[in-house]
Amino acid sequence: MILILLGPPGAGKGTQAKLLSSELGIPHISTGDMFRDHKARGTEIGKQVQAIMDAGGLVTDDITNAMVKERLSRPDVAPGFILDGYPRTVVQAEYLDGLLRSLGRSIDRALSYEVPEELVVERISGRRSCPRCGAVYHVSQNPPHRAGFCDRDDAALVQREDDKPENVRKRMQEYGTKTEPLKRYYRDRGELSDVEGVGTPEGILAVTKKVLGR
């Protein structure tokens, strides 16, 4: 089974990807993991990605597509895979379709996790992290034992600039603008299913499996 997971920041698609990977026995492939893998291996792609990120630029479609092509050449994807964070644009989706066709394959389903904006704002703006050890907390869902301080090293917790409510709303708007054409692309092909992304991870997994006929 080949699945594509879509959803705004804070929709929980990364959590669902991990649960589905375990449930279906197929690898979870995320763009972030691919970037880190290439950087760790010191590949030419990894060096290009690092140079772009150091300059504050955006990784091009060509580089991202090349990473996906390399990843899909590995034997562990034979039974299927779950893509998280790719494709992000119609251009990438068209490339992926062509790549899969060349391999005699096609996607089974694109899943779009739908979450109300205010819930996304609450999920993300409640995050707090430790600047010393990197531990991540949430003010209501996973609070530290002592409010505002890390359990591990007692450092004062901070809120990332990106996680402030006004910036989360801005990211949601950007996501909607960029992703709507992609959702339309898969919807027009009869490959898109909307999934209610509200509830416990286990509950959302149950809904996802029902959508997939599992």
Curated annotation (Swiss-Prot):
Q: Which domain of life is it from?
A: Bacteria
Taxonomy of the source species:
Bacteria, Pseudomonadati, Myxococcota, Myxococcia, Myxococcales
Q: Which Pfam families match?
A: ADK, ADK_lid
Listed GO biological process terms: AMP salvage
So what does this thing catalyse? Answer: AMP + ATP = 2 ADP
Residues noted as binding AMP in the record, renumbered to the chain: T31, R36, G57, L58, V59, G85, Y86, P87, R88, Q92, R160, R171
| UniProt pathway | Purine metabolism; AMP biosynthesis via salvage pathway; AMP from ADP: step 1/1
| Protein name (record) | Adenylate kinase
On subunit structure and binding partners, the annotation says: Monomer.
Residues the entry annotates as binding Zn(2+): C130, C133, C150, D153
